[in-house]
């Protein structure tokens, strides 16, 4: 793990998932906005001067191998549970109940879920606004939920923060879901800082790691 180790040891993480948009004012005074789809996740990660060089030489080698050309799968909160509060699931279902949900369809800004097999007659919200959701079985792209979603015993429609991204060779119908800290991103480095060895036996990075989600 290269980028994942950086995430796990971050002193701060900036998550930028704003839409890429341009705005112009026409000669008639009308404001027009064009949005580029899909929007992507950008992570700016700083690491304090605390990692020990002698026990992290393999990390340095892995970061040099990845550089800005090779992608890595990362999570926030699974590898380092101390970060789980960032992505933690907020809804009312148990992990076992989440595992009983399957996907019916996913198009545009919605994911439709089949909840008929969910046991225990749960009540309340299946998702809270801001929850993370991702299809399972190696689907690449996570989403956030844009409104509270109340549980229904048959089907629920989950509004998501960006248009659903098709993945070559991936069948949506019948898949399960991942939520909370179980979601992952595939990223490459836009900026991979150099490092210095400082007394005693510590690594100092020259700046932030800037990681961008890879859309294939």
Predicted features, each with a name:
Residues 1-216:
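Extracellular/virion structural assembly segments
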């Amino acid at each position: 793990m290269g980028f994942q180790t950086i995430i796990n040891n971050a002193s701060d993480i900036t998550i930028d998932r704003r839409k890429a948009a341009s705005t112009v004012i026409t000669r008639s005074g009308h404001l027009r906005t064009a949005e580029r789809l899909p929007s992507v996740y950008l992570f700016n990660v700083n690491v304090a001067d605390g990692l020990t060089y002698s026990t992290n030489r393999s990390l340095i080698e892995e970061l040099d191998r990845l550089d800005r050309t090779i992608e890595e799968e990362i999570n926030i909160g699974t590898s380092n549970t101390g970060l789980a509060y960032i992505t933690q699931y907020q809804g009312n279902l148990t992990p076992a109940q989440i595992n009983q949900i399957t996907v019916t369809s996913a198009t545009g800004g919605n994911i439709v879920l089949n909840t008929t097999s969910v046991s225990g007659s749960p009540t309340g919200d299946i998702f809270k606004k801001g929850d993370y959701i991702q299809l399972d079985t190696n689907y690449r792209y996570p989403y956030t939920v844009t409104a509270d979603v109340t549980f229904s015993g048959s089907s629920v429609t989950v509004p998501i923060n960006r248009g659903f991204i098709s993945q070559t060779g991936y069948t949506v119908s019948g898949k399960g879901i991942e939520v909370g800290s179980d979601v992952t991103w595939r990223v490459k480095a836009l900026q991979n800082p150099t490092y210095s060895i400082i007394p005693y036996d510590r690594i100092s990075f020259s700046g932030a790691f800037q990681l961008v989600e890879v859309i294939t």
